[in-house]
Amino acid sequence: MNASSWSLRNLPWFRATLAQWRYALRNTIAMCLALTVAYYLNLDEPYWAMTSAAVVSFPTVGGVISKSLGRIAGSLLGAIAALLLAGHTLNEPWFFLLSMSAWLGFCTWACAHFTNNVAYAFQLAGYTAAIIAFPMVNITEASQLWDIAQARVCEVIVGILCGGMMMMILPSSSDATALLTALKNMHARLLEHASLLWQPETTDAIRAAHEGVIGQILTMNLLRIQAFWSHYRFRQQNARLNALLHQQLRMTSVISSLRRMLLNWPSPPGATREILEQLLTALASSQTDVYTVARIIAPLRPTNVADYRHVAFWQRLRYFCRLYLQSSQELHRLQSDVDDHARLPRTSGLARHTDNAEAMWSGLRTFCTLMMIGAWSIASQWDAGANALTLAAISCVLYSAVAAPFKSLSLLMRTLVLLSLFSFVVKFGLMVQISDLWQFLLFLFPLLATMQLLKLQMPKFAALWGQLIVFMGSFIAVTNPPVYNFADFLNDNLAKIVGVALAWLAFAILRPGSDARKSRRHIRALRRDFVDQLSRHPTLSESEFESLTYHHVSQLSNSQDALARRWLLRWGIVLLNCSHVVWQLRDWESRSDPLSRVRDNCISLLRGVMSERGVQQKSLAATLEELQRICDSLARHHQPAARELAAIVWRLYCSLSQLEQAPPQGTLAS
């Protein structure tokens, strides 16, 4: 190691930028202030206020507000549950254990059905009840229940208020800026994505890019929610933001649909690729208008109206251009703060799907884990069993919803071991020698500031530093009055580590469903919703089914099972393209009764091919032949409406043809 690596420039305090110092100082002051206020309010465990301030330390105002609301609601609900359950079962330890395990299992199940601050509220309701109720097993007076519950809630609220106040004093980046930047970047990336997908090749890079675009658009919904909570203007523009997200999803679908047509088009015009690249280059410019676009794509206009392939591609390309220009105009209105609510209709938020089987399994895992640890604690008369139960409850509730629970639990184990060693040195080497809180704060403030800076400067270890910051308060355990008992300290820390280790064991025995099994469940749900789309009065609108389909696809975006991801993506895109054709057929009107019967026949053909169980290959082959025959017949028809219908039916043919290599029912392998 050379001497330059030890220079002052490489120290975290000198490497930090102004934004990093603002973030570190804001969170450090909030945590120290929360600890001080809770300590002088004579709350018995003021370190929970410091932990609460650390948890809500989001980099944006909207994130702090939404998470704080969820934390307050969850803490109140958890405190009420703890009072009711512990108050009625305090003298019956087995019944107490059963009721608390059932409550935490319910909270684990419920948080899987929601997103954002609602899911966070249910998580808090679960482990706040655990934090309050499990230590109550050693008390004898029922009146202490209320004292402990209100102390925990007050500590949480103090931490939230301190975090919110420091966010107002030292504000960070604007949620509005982050959202608008993300929308503009995605708007530009859609053109790059179109250029990639309209290539004739089929590679894993194309699939990964498509999954990435879908995931980024769905992630922007979180930015929209944060902007909603932090800016009055974005609360007024919420309908427009929802419509913009739906538009970007629709453009993603149209890009995919155009790719299918290009791959199934035997002889496209020779200059198609060059014209498409010229079009994408022009759309990237903010000065491009509809007339410029019309001049560029004019050479692609079909000269033979009987060429239904050319007509279908032309119509879909024009639709994509119109969507992109409309989205550009809406983004410009958002940036310029134009108050015009009549431009876009009110649109619902992005739909989502809950895997009920996985949610039930997670709730059952939490219930069984706590029953096992509780039974062991009761049978062995372990004094620190409450700490093991509390950490196991937190681990089961928090990590049931993550993609890699074993990695997260292993990281938490490492965090607890490091904090046990660190807190031993701090508690019995420093804290026993000081008598005033301000002396301890002189040590705590620079320590927290340095840890916050390291979290920002070491992204590879950001999760570790974040957990060290959040859990440090409960290990140092600044109480009022202070307690220094080495036996209790060792027993409590050992119990916390054992609780997480047993939660890890529970995840190993009651393992989450494999990605292949999850993929089959998502595909089955997609097919079930698509069958509903074929009915005369579908439950979901076209946009709702589209966002729901993309939500299904995004659920395995981090999966290592390439086959499961590939077939979930393929089924989602196929069914989505077919649903767009079905909606267009449903809206298509003709005065010719024979043509209307042809349209109805196309929809009925889909009903014969698709079911919740899968696709029948024999029926699929016959349906594709029939659709091709319908296209050829309509192309020779004398009515313009018939040739228009032929173009729509050919799009349906292109979408369905991708399922010719679909795996057998119940598997993901051919």
Swiss-Prot record:
Cystine connections: none
Alphabetized UniProt keyword annotations: Cell membrane, Membrane, Transmembrane, Transmembrane helix, Transport
One Pfam assignment: FUSC
InterPro entries reported in the protein's UniProt record: PHBA_efflux_AaeB/fusaric-R
Compartments where found: Cell membrane
Membrane topology: Multi-pass membrane protein
A GO MF label: transmembrane transporter activity
Transmembrane segments: 23-42, 47-69, 76-98, 118-140, 153-170, 381-403, 410-432, 437-454, 461-483, 493-510
Broad class of where this protein is predominantly found: membrane
Record flagged with keyword Transmembrane helix: yes
Family to which this protein belongs: Belongs to the aromatic acid exporter ArAE (TC 2.A.85) family.
Gene this chain is encoded by: ydhK
Identification of the protein by name: Uncharacterized transporter YdhK
One Gene Ontology CC term in the entry: plasma membrane
Origin species: Escherichia coli O157:H7
